[in-house]
């Protein structure tokens, strides 16, 4: 019986580090962000719908989607953001499900769905267990400023656009505290996976 793990966290909480640790343990990871990029490639159904709704001004000269431009259009406009989500989310969900079923058929011990907005997008029904990667608020802010070269104001706005991390922690089956070293994070992950009978 394959255990489907939903991996999530706050922005800049170090989720990709944990995602990589799963891969090193030979546990397949289905990454929602990668799929979200693939489903809007030129010629795909979601791409065509986006151009229909948002017009050609969200395209680059080569006809591919200009993601930063589209991002700035929807970031400050709730209605447009919801329109975009209505196009992209079903396409992402369908592709994640397709890959998940493939790994289940292969008889994998576990498969990870790496979904940054697992709770916000109401996708918990896709998974059996939820693992949240958490950090202290100050760590999160500093990491995001450094990683994306954001001002404190920009970083705070991005963090506040998501469900608060402490709320995600409350809803999790297990939590990894990612304030420490990589080794400490790895140890926590291994303990959780042993408790879930996924690794020996």
Swiss-Prot record:
<comment type="pathway">
    <text>Cofactor biosynthesis; coenzyme A biosynthesis; CoA from (R)-pantothenate: step 5/5.</text>
</comment>
<feature type="domain" description="DPCK">
    <location>
        <begin position="4"/>
        <end position="200"/>
    </location>
</feature>
<dbReference type="InterPro" id="IPR027417">
    <property type="entry name" value="P-loop_NTPase"/>
</dbReference>
<feature type="binding site">
    <location>
        <begin position="12"/>
        <end position="17"/>
    </location>
    <ligand>
        <name>ATP</name>
    </ligand>
</feature>
<comment type="similarity">
    <text>Belongs to the CoaE family.</text>
</comment>
<dbReference type="InterPro" id="IPR001977">
    <property type="entry name" value="Depp_CoAkinase"/>
</dbReference>
<keyword id="KW-0547">Nucleotide-binding</keyword>
<comment type="function">
    <text>Catalyzes the phosphorylation of the 3'-hydroxyl group of dephosphocoenzyme A to form coenzyme A.</text>
</comment>
<protein>
    <recommendedName>
        <fullName>Dephospho-CoA kinase</fullName>
        <ecNumber>2.7.1.24</ecNumber>
    </recommendedName>
</protein>
<keyword id="KW-0808">Transferase</keyword>
<dbReference type="GO" id="GO:0004140">
    <property type="term" value="F:dephospho-CoA kinase activity"/>
</dbReference>
<dbReference type="Pfam" id="PF01121">
    <property type="entry name" value="CoaE"/>
</dbReference>
<keyword id="KW-0963">Cytoplasm</keyword>
<dbReference type="GO" id="GO:0015937">
    <property type="term" value="P:coenzyme A biosynthetic process"/>
</dbReference>
<keyword id="KW-0173">Coenzyme A biosynthesis</keyword>
<dbReference type="GO" id="GO:0005737">
    <property type="term" value="C:cytoplasm"/>
</dbReference>
<dbReference type="GO" id="GO:0005524">
    <property type="term" value="F:ATP binding"/>
</dbReference>
<keyword id="KW-0418">Kinase</keyword>
<keyword id="KW-0067">ATP-binding</keyword>
